[in-house]
Amino acid sequence: MPVLKKEIELSDGKKIWVRQASGMEKLPIENIQAKIFRKTRHFGADPAEWTPEQNEEFADMLDEAGGGMADQIQAWIPNCVIEPADFDINTLTSEEVRTILSFVRGDTLEGAVPLG
């Protein structure tokens, strides 16, 4: 599947173009996530069936290993906001960061078009 891009409207009405993180960009964090998942396989194969405590332990382990949400944001968002070229990512609100991250990592694809 190709890397996609999408126009996202910010809370102040500005629009930015964002692309998904590539496989090569995602690889280091995905490796961390896989290692932590293997360490917690005794929780069960389906994370949707884990207890809240198990989910919290998993999230804490991800954070400690460098694969948590903050790590994803820092690794991917600066490179994935592609237009305008001079956009200052430090002006994004927390809600905007979460919206962008959801697209960048491939959770939401609505309205996306191929990058090329």
Identify the role of each PLM range.
Residues 2-4, 19-116:
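Short, surface-exposed, charged amphipathic helix/loop patches that serve as local interaction elements
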Residues 4-13:
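Short acidic-hydrophobic surface loop/beta-edge motif
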Residues 16:
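Short N-terminal binding/cap micro-motifs at the start of the first secondary-structure element
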